[in-house]
Amino acid sequence: MKKNLLLTLTLCLLAQWSVAQAPKWVEKAKRAVFSVVTYDESDKILNTGNGFFVTEDGMALSDYSLFKGAQRAVVINSEGEQMPVEVIMGANDMYDVVKFRVAISGKKVPALVVSPTAPTVGTSVYLLPYSTQKDRSYTAGQVKEESKVEGQYHYYTLDMHLKDKMVSCPVMTADGQVFGLAQKSSGKDTATICYAVGADYAMSQKISPLSFNDHALSSIGIKKALPDTEEQALVYLYMASSQQ
């Protein structure tokens, strides 16, 4: 009995120490993390997961798997407020990322700054979970390996245990910038290893004139954004109309 009590007290003290040691930016940064709920064509819940804002006007990142087959989606912020996903801005099914814009309810939302540089191997990193509580909880780990995606973007192996409900939560540098989206590992190393696709790669996803035939995008029933330039947008609209 005494041993169990001692163990409980020790765990509580460790948890309190972890929160006390949390970087000062954690509580504020967690406000940019949200829950995502997607719905199918019958308006029944399809999937639930996580995502986070990367601009104050509502641009956000999450995992593609969450949106595949969805006809609509909403995000629920740390205050419990629901906001609809307005348009899909890009997606990649191989690396399981999606970029989208949320129809925000106010003038701006809390957003994370995407790190311009990749953290080096051995660097301490922090995963921020979605929470409606104002706390500074996080999961700490280290960068185990770093590799390239398409020659210029990044993919990471992390020394970090990832729970199911933490997929697509932001992984942060020590100075509070997001560099990756958390992804699950498979096999025998799931207890100690997880992965993160670079936030830089997720941000690079976009709609091009040829995106109308993109299988990953067409598998999402939510409205797509137009390409960035007027010329590309006209080509995209022409391609779309010719397929109808």
Predicted regions and their residues:
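A conserved glycine-rich beta-strand in the N-terminal activation segment of trypsin-fold
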Residues: 21-23, 38-57, 63, 81-84, ...
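Conserved active-site neighborhood of the chymotrypsin/trypsin-like protease fold
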Residues: 55-137, 152-155, 164-166, 231-233, ...
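Sec-dependent N-terminal signal peptides
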Residues: 4-14
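Catalytic nucleophile loop of clan PA
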Residues: 162-182
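C-terminal cap/linker of serine protease catalytic domains
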Residues: 21-27, 70, 107-109, 178-242
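A short, Trp-centered hydrophobic/proline-enriched beta-strand micro-motif
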Residues: 27-42, 237
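Sec/Tat signal peptide C-region and signal peptidase I cleavage site
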Residues: 14-20
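Terminal peptide-recognition signature
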Residues: 34-36, 51, 58, 62, ...
